[in-house]
A protein has these predicted regions:
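Extracytoplasmic gate region of multi-pass secondary transporters
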Residues: 27-28, 211-252
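Cytoplasmic helix-loop-helix junction between adjacent transmembrane helices
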Residues: 102-143
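A membrane-interface helix-boundary motif in multi-pass transporters
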Residues: 157-169, 361-381
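Helix-loop-helix hairpin linking two adjacent transmembrane segments in secondary transporters
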Residues: 136-183
């Protein structure tokens, strides 16, 4: 694959990540709106968030039965089209129950996209450039925060809460058209000798102790952040008195900072080592966790923005080396199944974090959120535990590429 085609592939995968991350991320800053529109509690809002991630976790487990049995491109397009349809159902929902069902459907189809994208990266990109590639794709998180979430919040404030989901649908349709051109045929894994049964493939994947440690590692890593993340906007509005317009500004500034930091962390992970970078970020993760949950009432907007930037640079930055570690911890023959199970572990970690965080916080008589700092304490404990588990994980530094690229690859530059 030429460098130009490789870059177009990374940008396409980043676009897919952007839309399905935006679909998930826009939920959390809209928390105050959903609690009012649907007349639900903070815990019920947490259930909306966790419903998506639980569904994504189940989807990841199911995907482990078929991810290595189809051409990566065809599977990616089918799942992405289904995700787009489910997001359209979210936009059309009118009640809490309808919206919950649509979120579950979006989780079932969207939950596999991240694992499949990481599998394609591991298939196509050599180990020595994998951290940089992960940084490009993972920067979609920052872009969704810089552009997608603020635009979504603006549309929700000026039109309705349905509008952000229509935005995701429109963008997804554009990405589908591009993906048809830029994603190559990847099917070398289909030609592996002595292919086992579906159940046998899963059993062979999970019977490797290194894989089990890796699944636990990634679950703990994402659970750290999701103890806190779903309730940030609710805390900002209820306790800090931040207006909707200022929340948009805070998200924009935070996303802009992580857009830069994601690329820097990806390059450093390749130069200094994925494990080394993850460890250093984890050692300081306590600072943003406690800072964002202990901000006092009356804090100036600039301080809130600084703390928010610190939080997402460090907390989300951990996911770049951790994703590269996971892609390299897989047995190459079982990479698709492994990454599906890895995605399931991440989704379940997010869901458990959102549910646990919702149980730790409550409201006082004045409607203020109390006990939010407990989510930070629990998150930091999980971060330390993930470091201990990481010591048990072995990575394959020279994982061979298993890519077969179609000779008639219709690269964008050929148009």
């Amino acid at each position: 694959m030429t460098p130009i085609r490789e870059r177009w592939l990374m940008l396409t995968l980043a676009g897919i990540q952007f839309t399905h991350i935006l679909d998930f991320m826009v939920m959390m800053p809209l928390g105050p709106q959903f609690t009012k529109v649907f007349s639900i509690s903070d815990a019920q809002f947490g259930a909306l968030v966790s419903a998506y991630t639980f569904a994504a976790g189940v989807s990841g487990l199911l995907a482990a039965t078929y991810l290595d049995r189809f051409d990566r491109k065809r599977l990616l397009l089918v799942l992405y089209c289904a995700f787009t349809t489910a997001t359209m159902a979210c936009a059309l929902s009118e009640t809490y129950v309808q919206f919950m069902g649509a979120r579950i459907a979006a989780g079932l189809f969207g939950g596999v996209l991240s694992a499949l994208s990481q599998t394609i990266i591991a298939d196509v990109i050599p180990f020595e450039r994998r951290g940089r590639a992960m940084g490009i794709v993972m920067s979609s998180f920052s872009v969704s925060t810089v552009a997608g979430v603020p635009i979504g919040l603006y549309l929700a404030a000026n039109l309705s809460w349905h509008a952000p989901f229509w935005l995701v649908v429109g963008l997804s349709l554009c990405v589908i058209a591009v993906a048809c051109v830029t994603v190559p045929k990847i099917d070398a894994h289909l030609h592996q000798p002595e292919r086992s049964s579906v159940v046998g493939g899963i059993l062979e994947t999970v019977k490797e102790t290194n894989h089990l440690w890796a699944f636990l590692f990634t679950g703990l890593s994402v659970m750290t952040g999701f103890m806190v993340i779903p309730y940030i906007t609710i805390y900002m509005e209820a306790n800090l008195g931040v207006s909707g317009d200022d929340i948009v500004l805070v998200y924009f500034v935070g996303g802009l900072a992580t857009l830069v930091s994601a690329r820097v962390i990806g390059v450093l992970a390749d130069k200094r080592g994925k494990v080394w970078i993850y460890q250093r970020l984890n050692w300081v993760v306590w600072l943003p966790l406690f800072a964002i949950t202990l901000l006092p009432n009356g804090s100036p907007l600039w301080l809130i923005a600084v703390v928010y930037v610190l939080f997402f640079v460090i907390v989300s930055g951990r996911m770049i080396p951790s994703s590269a570690i996971m892609a390299s911890a897989a047995n190459p023959k079982r990479r698709g199944t492994f990454m599906a199970l890895s995605g399931a572990s991440q989704s379940l970690g997010m869901a458990l974090g959102a549910v646990a965080g919702g149980l730790l916080i409550s409201r006082d008589a004045n409607g203020l959120v109390v006990g939010y700092w407990l989510t930070a304490a629990a998150g930091f404990a999980l971060a330390l535990l993930s470091l201990a588990v990481l010591n048990k994980v072995s990575v394959h530094a020279n994982t061979p590429s298993t890519t077969v690229v179609s000779p008639q690859f219709p690269g964008p530059e050929s148009g």
